[in-house]
């Protein structure tokens, strides 16, 4: 069903200073925002945490952009708070490795809004599923370094992404990697306020979240970076859990059973009593990556510290000797180019697509 035309309808707003409504003059209906009519939707390229994303052309400039329609279907009183958070955060952020919010445009009837973002030709999840040969270690280092630079910028600006995963990492044809989808991101301060633990896609979720902590710091992003680095190195997800219990068990199988000795405060986490953790005394990272250098293993160990306070920061990782030894990270411009999967109409995600990356 087509949206009503603005030119044919009056828009009336409730006045908060006195009773009644007033009619918005036609020349002020869009405020300082452009209309979505000025963009030609080319194809749907995906779905973020809180909205559908299209590849589109700005008819004024001919620029190709990503147009993210903000979900309003469950809202009766305006823009969802999650979308307001994303807009507010993205307007503050300007970094080469963070997706850029160019502007906000409005739908025909002012009941829908769209975020105009910088367009990236690829996302890493699609690449991992479709590329004929895996990334080389030099290419993996190039990708992860860019993710870390973007994260260091976020964390210095007191922002936690809270949903890092390969599908939220985009890449341009020039090899520039950008972190996207800030629908779950939060600004934090001191002292850290409680937040819901039900964030971060399961495979990338830190153990403290799985065990119910409401104290979230930048360390949850760093655990996810460890999962991403391991996934790129192994060419498949490291911890593909099917439930929260299974996810915890996979972590214990890989890293050993946590205890108060290595993770002070572990026994007081809200959900510890609900799980019976297997007794597993060994860290098996070296067995998982027998070919990885000592520096690479040290970096993974640092990222997978159980104790969030001891876990590597983005700055720590950027100083890691792993990125300074051979094979050295390749330059972004030398990253391979790939067919533009995002330029095709996106098919709905299937379990078959996920299992493809899970096979040994």
From Swiss-Prot:
Gene Ontology terms: biological process: cell projection organization; negative regulation of cell population proliferation; negative regulation of cilium assembly; peptidyl-threonine phosphorylation; positive regulation of MAPK cascade; regulation of actin cytoskeleton organization; regulation of cell cycle; regulation of cell cycle G2/M phase transition
Organism domain of life: Eukaryota
Keywords: ATP-binding, Cell projection, Cilium biogenesis/degradation, Cytoplasm, Cytoskeleton, Kinase, Nucleotide-binding, Phosphoprotein, Serine/threonine-protein kinase, Transferase
PROSITE patterns: PROTEIN_KINASE_ATP (PS00107), PROTEIN_KINASE_DOM (PS50011), PROTEIN_KINASE_ST (PS00108)
Residues annotated as the enzyme's active site: 163
Localization in the cell: Cytoplasm, Cytoskeleton, Cilium basal body
Protein name: Cyclin-dependent kinase 10
Source organism per UniProt: Homo sapiens
Gene: CDK10
